[in-house]
Amino acid sequence: MTNMRTMIPAGSSVLVWVTCLLLAFVTTVTGPKVIQPEVDTPLGRVRGRQVGVKDTDRMVNVFLGIPFAQAPVGPLRFSAPLPPQPWEGVRDASINPPMCLQDVEKMINSRFGLNEKIKIFPISEDCLTLNIYSPTEITAGDKRPVMVWIHGGSLLVGSSTSQDGSALAAYGDVVVVTVQYRLGIFGFLSTGDKHMPGNRGFLDVVAALRWVQGNIAPFGGDPNCVTIFGNSAGGMIVSSLFLSPISAGLFHRAISQSGIVTTIMMEDMKPWPEAQNFANSVACGSASPAELVQCLLQKEGKDLIKQKNVNISYIVNDSFFPQRPEKLLADQQFPTVPYLLGVTNHEFGWLLLKSLNILDKLEHLSREDLLEISRPFLAIMEVPPEIMPTVIDEYLDNGSDQSATRYAFQELLGDISFIIPTLNFSKYLRDAGCPVFLYEFQHTPSSFAKFKPAWVKADHASENSFVFGGPFLTDESSLLAFPEATEEEKQLSLTMMAQWSQFARTGNPNGKGLPPWPQLNQLEQYLEIGLESRTGVKLKKGRLQFWTETLPRKIQEWHREQRSRKVPEEL
């Protein structure tokens, strides 16, 4: 494989930096001085800090916690985001911002890293901020592509600072922006009307993208070359933005990593019943939406996040989703921008099972257990109880041992939650004329051996550390840092950073020295990403046929049989 460390060209954009200190490493009695870059934006001046990246001399300017909307506090708690207000003087953007209100214990239990580590920052309702990572080298007249990262976490947990964009910015020569959005009830609980509009978390991201359009140029970014990308719930948000009419023109490419809005894990909810259910749990029950919201506004935010068992998802029939996502897809109501998307080969390998508290049940899983645990997932897909054993038969042979039963369960959940939705989504886009690039990440990170069972392959979100250059992050306490990566894994990370940034730059992940990545066409080719990447054909062909043809036919036959039985009874 070609060494990617010298492949990516040096800086390519304009940026006028005002520094507080002119010399980066002038030693004094107090030690080396630190460069603190300052940038003038339309809203005010910000002061950041400068960081290095391993195995390269390139430096990155980092600006943390820049507000892209007014703080959603007080009467604005459940309102759509409002434009940010300008500030006087120089805003300190060198320290990590607070995370949006969330259940921190749940976040700790939902680790998306390779090393079972996570930084916990203070939580606050004043959290609509973004971080910017921009290479310091500049060439007059150029602007760098902008890559806007949307974090995952089931719309319940996560933060912008969990993903350090410095290595991707340095090696990819791009401006990386990581954004925060309101989580849980603060971002998605809705009365279904003006009193508490839904999809606020999505609207927060739209506000961030609008901020990027008007403010990213002073940081060296090109507002006409913006890529949105995200993993898990972040990938789902990317696909939602792609389908939403109100985000039109705010981005030019899209990347969804293991997350599509049409997944069964993110069904649209009935807003008013959910709002009433939650309000009753905090003594705010009311038949009046206005009174219900007023009561919730009086509650302490940290008390509201303690409540469990509330359904958090998107709603339809509003400005963000005027119709169901499936309808928007079928009617091709989306822009034909380049789209890169994919999955891992073991989506339910460990992480998601752990967060769902069903990991321990895998040790002695019988066929009956498999059916019972799968029932809620299949019910969401409207599979009749009488047909559910057919699904188990598809995944499990008679006489299978416990390891085969465990793998069948993991494969089943991975297919219905991520892989089949991703494959269906990619074909809709391909047929509409979008340039589509599909992948399956297949490498098992070497660090998994320290805390995951040997049977775990490429688990959910395991590609993140490679996309963000985990082996090259200087802050080894960072969630995605991967200091123990092998030389082969370092090379894989360099390759993936080059592919992702090349896609952001051109709309195509192919480039000199990179593994050939075919565009999705009628041959259904995709890239199998690993230490030795290669082209694959018709990912999960048999399973896709089962879910899109065989099972729907069996369900139709069952319904016809039920109707035919009712006719004699009525006579």
Curated annotation (Swiss-Prot):
Disulfide bridge partners, by residue number: 100-127, 284-295
Active site: 232 (acyl-ester intermediate), 347 (charge relay system), 460 (charge relay system)
Database matches in SUPFAM superfamilies: alpha/beta-Hydrolases (SSF53474)
Glycosylation sites: 311
EC annotation from Swiss-Prot or TrEMBL: 3.1.1.1
Keywords: Disulfide bond, Endoplasmic reticulum, Glycoprotein, Hydrolase, Serine esterase, Signal
One GO location term (cellular component): endoplasmic reticulum lumen
Catalytic activity: a carboxylic ester + H2O = an alcohol + a carboxylate + H(+)
Coiled-coil annotated spans: none
CDD domains associated with the record: Esterase_lipase
Enzyme class: hydrolase
Signal peptide: 1-31
Chief subcellular location: endoplasmic reticulum
Motif placement: Prevents secretion from ER: 568-571
Record localization: Endoplasmic reticulum lumen
GO terms for MF: carboxylesterase activity
Job of this protein: Involved in the detoxification of xenobiotics and in the activation of ester and amide prodrugs.
Family in the record: Belongs to the type-B carboxylesterase/lipase family.
Protein name (record): Carboxylesterase 3B
